[in-house]
Amino acid sequence: MEYQSSVENLDEDGYTQLDFSSRNITRRSVVSEKGLCAASSHWRLIAVTLGILCSVMLVITVVLSTSGIWRSSSGNNLLKSDSFPSRNKDNQSQPTQSSLEDSVIPTKALTTTGVFSSSCPPNWITHEDSCYLFSTLLDSWDGSKRQCFQLGSHLLKIDSSKELEFISRQVSSQPDHSFWIGLSRRQTEEPWLWEDGSTLLSNLFQIRSTVTEKDSSHNCAWIHVSDIYDQLCSVHSYSICEKKLSV
């Protein structure tokens, strides 16, 4: 049997035939398998890399979306809070008694012609039986009236020519400013009344008119230097508060 196998491998001249074809096929199959493994590893690396990139992009997208929603919600809440201010905010904007009493005219007239008394609150000056506060808070006539009320007083009421002279000395050092007093009227044709409802004495002083053709509703009064003028009640100006001297 061995002899027959050897004979089959001999050619016509008696040389042995080598089976190179089977070996070549085996080598090619091995090379092909190695190539497939290398290619598979290469694509697997690419797939893993792409998967990681997609995951990162997904995380970034989620974070940005969440941030955008939070900012939008915050913006809406801010608009709501600005559009509908709370009552506390309005209350905080109101002047306190301390700020009202501190807002006095810092002039020489106050220290030379006015007298500070322990019977009056700080920054108030004394004249006869009354205390006076010359406020530098700019407000309308109604607003100034409320400020004085908060301090337990009222807008200035002039009862005599002597009191008018005293007040004129205090405000004459402020020629650029006018001061609301407690004199007003409901209509142009109606009489001038003080806050307590009493009428203005005709022989005490005359009210100078500032009425123009465009606007005739000057129904509040202020003092400028030594004269009294009518004026629009909505105009913002300084004011004078008065209250009786404490015994």
Curated annotation (Swiss-Prot):
Task: Give the record's subunit note.
Answer: Homodimer. Interacts with SYK; participates in leukocyte activation in presence of fungal pathogens. Interacts with CD37; this interaction controls CLEC7A-mediated IL-6 production.
Q: Where does (1,3-beta-D-glucosyl)n bind?
A: 146-153, 195
Which residue spans traverse the membrane? 45-65
Which residues are glycosylated according to the annotation?
91
Residue ranges annotated for the C-type lectin domain, each copy included = 127-242
Return the annotated region ranges for Disordered: 81-103
Protein name (Swiss-Prot/TrEMBL):
C-type lectin domain family 7 member A
Q: Where is this chain compositionally biased, Polar residues type?
A: 81-101
Enumerate the UniProt keywords alphabetically.
Cell membrane, Disulfide bond, Glycoprotein, Immunity, Inflammatory response, Innate immunity, Lectin, Membrane, Metal-binding, Phosphoprotein, Signal-anchor, Transmembrane, Transmembrane helix
Q: Choose any GO biological process term that the UniProt entry carries and state it.
A: phagocytosis, recognition
GO MF entries: (1->3)-beta-D-glucan binding; metal ion binding; pattern recognition receptor activity
All ranges on the Extracellular side of the membrane: 66-247
Q: Where is this motif: ITAM-like?
A: 15-18
- To which species is this protein native? Bos taurus (Bovine)
Identify the domain of life.
Answer: Eukaryota
Query: Where does this protein reside within or beyond the cell?
Result: Cell membrane
Per its UniProt record, what InterPro entries does this chain match? C-type_lectin-like, C-type_lectin-like/link_sf, CLEC7A, CTDL_fold, NKR-like_CTLD
Q: List the disulfide bonds.
A: 120-131, 148-241, 220-233
Q: Does the keyword Metal-binding apply?
A: yes
Q: Which residues bind a divalent metal cation?
A: 157, 159, 163, 242
- Gene Ontology CC annotation, any one: cell surface
